[in-house]
């Protein structure tokens, strides 16, 4: 009683998605607690599905924090705030995991002040054109995530982290990747906010290149 039953024609997709979800959260449970990552407390199989228990934190999202601010952050402020997130992403990468959903909505600023990354998702959930309804974050999702024919990698998280930093120092969400592929109208951070040093602006631009091979490859 209470077991989740997929539609007959979706049974294979359901089983595959369930396995992918369990594998991901088992790995996250083994990895956390870790600096900059929201902790997975337990993973359970019941009712023909899988449940993951994630630590609940009091605080606000980075998105909400930026909305409340009256000015943009300086590059130094942005780096300080994102430092634990970068450490967490580096931990994911060393463990063979890729987040694929880094954005202001998935960065939590707890009351204790140490930012944590949440919003974990499977590959299929973070890939356009997959059999699942994808959950991508325009402006932060890398171009390769919009096609099932392209491969995401550590460089995908590099793009998203740079996009988040761009938002923090300019106050503007980056142009979404599909639009950039048609006409790349992404303005440099320095041109939008004169207080952003040219070198810092160039680092962000490099990390947000449309071609994954031309970006930094990891954090």
Identify the function of each model-found stretch:
Residues 42-43:
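Activation-segment/catalytic-loop signature of the eukaryotic protein kinase fold
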Residues 85-97:
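Protein kinase catalytic-loop region centered on the HRD/HxD motif
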Residues 62-73:
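AlphaC helix of the protein kinase catalytic domain
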Residues 81-82:
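Activation segment signature within eukaryotic-like protein kinase domains
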Residues 139-219:
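C-terminal lobe helix-coil module of Hanks-type protein kinase domains
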Residues 47-61:
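Conserved short submotifs of the Hanks-type protein kinase catalytic core
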Residues 25-35:
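Structural motif at the C-terminus of the N-lobe alphaC helix and the adjacent alphaC-beta4 loop
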Residues 1-22, 26-27:
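ATP-binding glycine-rich loop module of kinase domains
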């Amino acid at each position: 009683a209470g077991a989740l039953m997929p539609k007959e024609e979706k049974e294979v997709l359901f089983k595959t998605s369930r396995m992918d979800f369990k594998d991901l959260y088992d790995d996250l449970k083994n990895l956390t607690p870790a600096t900059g990552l929201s902790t997975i407390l337990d993973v359970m199989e019941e009712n023909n599905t899988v449940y993951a228990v994630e630590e609940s934190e009091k605080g606000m999202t980075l998105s909400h924090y930026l909305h409340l601010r009256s000015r943009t952050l300086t590059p130094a402020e942005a780096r300080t705030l994102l430092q634990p997130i970068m450490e967490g992403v580096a931990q994911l990468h060393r463990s063979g995991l890729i987040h694929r959903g880094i954005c202001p909505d998935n960065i939590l600023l707890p009351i204790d002040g140490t930012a944590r990354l949440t919003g974990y998702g499977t590959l299929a959930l973070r890939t356009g054109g997959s059999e699942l309804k994808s959950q991508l974050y325009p402006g932060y999702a890398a171009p390769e995530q919009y096609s099932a024919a392209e491969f995401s990698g550590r460089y995908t998280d590099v793009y998203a982290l740079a996009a988040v930093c761009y938002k923090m120092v300019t106050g503007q969400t980056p142009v979404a990747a599909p639009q950039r592929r048609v006409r790349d109208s992404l303005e440099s951070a320095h041109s939008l906010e004169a207080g952003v040093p040219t070198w810092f602006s160039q680092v962000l631009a490099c990390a947000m290149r449309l071609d994954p091979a031309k970006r930094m490859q990891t954090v």
